[in-house]
Every structure is written in structure tokens, then in C-alpha cells.
Amino acid sequence: MTIMRKSHPLLKIMNHSFIDLPTPSNISSWWNFGSLLGICLMIQILTGLFLAMHYTSDTTTAFSSVAHICRDVNYGWLIRYLHANGASMFFICLFIHVGRGIYYGSYTLRETWNIGILLLFTTMATAFVGYVLPWGQMSFWGATVITNLLSAIPYIGTTLVEWIWGGFSVDKATLTRFFAFHFILPFIITALVLVHLLFLHETGSNNPSGLNSDSDKIPFHPYYTIKDLLGIFLLLTVLMTLTLFFPDLLGDPDNFTPANPLNTPAHIKPEWYFLFAYAILRSIPNKLGGVLALILSILILAAFPLLNPSKQHGLAYRPITQTLYWIFIANILILTWIGGQPVEYPFTTIGQVSSILYFAIIIIFMPIASMIENNILKLHF
């Protein structure tokens, strides 16, 4: 008799995805972050659901409802800070996941990569609208500044901004619709994750060597389920440490002040995980140019499969491109730092140089390095 997990219509899908899935035997811990992202998404949906039970999306009561959750709801403070810091953990895992994809050449799996970019955009949109909900000073002014960027679109810009706001400024209508978006988007993300996995399992996973691993596959369970469990425990340890000991470490002090349209904070800045893109936006003096650079800073990931002339898969045996990759990572960290600094010399100049370098490494230097490496291989073999 066939084992039930191999014959039952529903269990069969689970079996092919998480149990009997043929997996390369040499994938390292960098491949753990996919499952960690799944855990982060589950934590965010669960904590968000409990927060939504007590939150009110009205400008007069939103700020006090968050205070009420922290003070009066049983373990409300824990749920709120798990949700806020869970978002930070989500983005840390997300950036490492994308970084691993670039390093090991996972962008050659085109469909999986493109759905991944769509997931990144959707997650960023979810985090942005979520940051507005506590209705603190930085929530309000962040929403005003970022949505106002759409006014740079020729002809329809101003109309589009007023349509998103639901009026002539960020107000009650904006907060209500942002809450609606923040509630629905995680479920759209979940659906996209399933499509992401569907495409991944069509081709099979990549591996650190960049070679075809069809001849050396092992079942996902128990080998990688145990490995993923270790990663999950480490993730939860970091998340709980952050939540219980340093809950406000990654937040902004301005957000402890209720939103006031008549008082602008000294430095308006988004959450830390958007700072690199915000620095690129600020480094261009033209408004429309800045908006385009902001979008391109993420959309350029879609160009990786097109800008890869290398004969090798991944960077494991490509020292020149490896060096460029780590310069690129360091550059993103510099941009993140610049995004949190005031708009004054020398920060503006550093931001402009880093922004140019960000695009130049991807569009110019990496393809050239790949061609040089191809020629070196021709000379020696």
C-alpha cells in the first residue's frame, strides 16, 4: 500500500514541497533564509492580527489605541514590539536572501527571481503603510514626504497624490486606507510566496558550487528540516533578545510624539531598512530623477540575468567579481548610514558618490569583470 503522504491529494503537494523534495547535498546556511522569511511572515501575520483587534484607524484615536495596546491589553506590549522588531528581522533576512541570490547566481532562475523582486516591492509597500499606522510624528511626516514624491509624475502627479491621500493632505481617509492596505498586503505576499516556491520547485534549487547537482540530491526531510529548525531557533533568539531588551533600538524617538501637521521634525527619515534607497533618492537634486532612481535601486535587480556574460554560475570561483560584490555590500551599508544623516556637507557628497557607485558596479563593473574572467579561463584552459 502507498504511504498516505504520497497518495492523498493535499498531502502529496506538501510531500513534494517539504519532505521528499530532491535537494542539492551541499547547500550551505545561506539557503536557510527562505524558511526564515516564511517564519517571519507567519509571525507578522499572527501578531498583526492581534494588533488589528485593538487598533483604531482614526486620526483622533490611532496614537492612543497603540498606547492602550501597550498598557492595557494582556501582553499587548509584547505583541506590538514583536510586530515592530519582527519587521526588522524580516528585512534583515530578506536582504541576506537577495544577497545570496546575487552571490551564487540564483538570478538565472528567471521566474523565481522576478517573483522575488515583486515580493520585495510588495513587502516594502506593506512596511511603509504599516509605519504610518501608529500616527506618531515620523509616521505622519514620512507618509507626507514619500507619498508627495508621486507628484513628480508629469501631468497626473498632483491628482494621483490627492487620490491616494483621499483629500488635500494626509488625514483620516489616508490612515483608514493605509490600514486596509496593511491588512490585505501580507495575504497577497503569502500568495506570491506560494508562486515563488512553485517556480523554484520547477527548476530545483541552486547550490554553492554553481554546478549541476542532479547527480547528487538528498531528500529535504530530515536533513534540511533539522537544519532549518536550528536557523529558526537562532532567529527567534535574536528576535526575542531585541524585543525584550532593546525594543525601541531600531525605532525613531519622534514617533513617541503624536502626529502634528503644524510641527515638522528636524530630520524626516523612514525606517532603517529603507535608508539606502532614501539616500539614493536624496542624492539627486531633481525630484522626478530622484523618484526614478529610488524605483530603479530595487528594479535594477531584474537586470542581473541580462547583465551576466559570465561562463560560470555564481561567484564561488570568480575573485574579481567577488571583490566587486563585497564593495557593493559595503556601499549599501554606507548608503544606509547616509540616509539617516542630515542633508548637509559632507553627507550629501558621500551619498552622491555612493549612489553613482551603486549603479555603476551593477551596470558597468560587474559585466566587465565577468568578461575579463572569461578571457582568463580561455588563456589557461
From Swiss-Prot:
GO terms for biological process: mitochondrial electron transport, ubiquinol to cytochrome c. One of its GO terms (molecular function) is ubiquinol-cytochrome-c reductase activity. It is found in: Mitochondrion inner membrane. A ubiquinone binds at H201. The chain crosses the membrane at residues 33-53, 77-98, 113-133, 178-198, 226-246, 288-308, 320-340, 347-367. Its cofactor is heme b. Keywords: Electron transport, Heme, Iron, Membrane, Metal-binding, Mitochondrion, Mitochondrion inner membrane, Respiratory chain, Transmembrane, Transmembrane helix, Transport, Ubiquinone. Binds 2 heme b groups non-covalently. This is Cytochrome b. It comes from Kunsia tomentosus (Woolly giant rat).
